[in-house]
Structure formats: C-alpha cells, structure tokens
C-alpha cells in the first residue's frame, strides 16, 4: 500500500458527525492495521491531526514513512495553534502591533514544531527526502519490503467497527 499524504485535517462540523465520519474513518484505520502487505507513506505537504493518522503513519504500522522537506506535520497548522496557545494569545492581545507578534509566533511555531526534521528526530518519520528522488526511494522501499511476511493467526480476526 502506498500513501501520498497531503491532508490539512478533518473539517469539523455536525454534518460530518451525523454522517458518521468517526465510524467510517474507523473502518479505514482497521483495514490499515489488518493489512499484511508493505505499507509506505510519503508526506508531500500537510499532515495535520487525525487526518494525518488516517493516512497510515508509524503508529498504525507503516513500514516506512518519508517526508518532503517542505512537509508540515503537527497536531494543527501554525496559524490555528497560535490562536489557542494562551501565552501567545495574551502576548498578541497586549502587543502594540498584534499582526507582527502573531506573524512572529507563527514563524516560531513552524520552526519549533511544524517541520519534518523535528518529527523525524522524534522517530515518526524515517527519512526526509528530496521531491526529485521520491520515485526512486519508493522503488527502493518496495524492493526492500518485497520479502516482508506478516501473517495473522489462522481463524483469528479482529472486530471491525461497522
């Protein structure tokens, strides 16, 4: 399974909740976890929150996760994060130039938390790759994982969330 991930997140709202986004998302996550084939994820641009998890990350059992240098991987985007971090909110509110303080806070957040090198250092991404090498890196990964053998016990199955 090859995942090319660019997910800005789930669109929150009652329409999605009533439509069963959690239930349907759980079916997809269950399928990832039960799959015994090689699973490779390439994060192209954005990977935020629950939507990032839904694109087969390391915690879901991806064999290899690669990211482009421009990828942004975090719980949420920088502009949203600075709006909810209480110390930053106070600083912006009390500033003479709120726009400049907010822009500096966004830049600081992106540098500290929202880049693939930080995430790779924490072990959530295996490698940060150049976009031009993506095809060759995927081919190499598939070659490396061609002998992967993962089997589930006979007559054992999980409890799929229907």
Label the model's feature ranges:
Residues 1-162:
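Ligand-binding clefts of soluble mixed alpha/beta catalytic domains
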């Amino acid at each position: 399974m090859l995942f090319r991930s660019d997910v800005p997140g789930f669109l929150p709202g009652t329409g999605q909740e009533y439509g069963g986004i959690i239930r349907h998302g759980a079916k997809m996550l269950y399928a990832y976890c039960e799959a015994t084939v090689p699973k490779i994820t390439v994060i192209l641009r954005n990977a935020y929150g629950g939507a990032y998890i839904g694109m087969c990350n390391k915690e879901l059992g991806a064999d290899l996760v690669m990211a482009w240098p421009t990828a942004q991987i975090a719980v949420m985007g920088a502009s949203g994060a600075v709006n909810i971090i209480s110390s930053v909110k106070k600083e912006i509110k009390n500033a003479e130039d709120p726009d400049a303080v907010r822009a500096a806070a966004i830049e600081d957040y992106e540098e500290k938390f929202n880049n693939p090198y930080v995430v790779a250092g924490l072990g959530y991404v295996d490698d940060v790759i150049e976009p031009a090498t993506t095809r060759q890196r995927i081919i190499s990964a598939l070659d490396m994982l061609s002998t992967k053998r993962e089997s589930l016990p006979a007559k054992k199955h999980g409890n799929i969330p229907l």
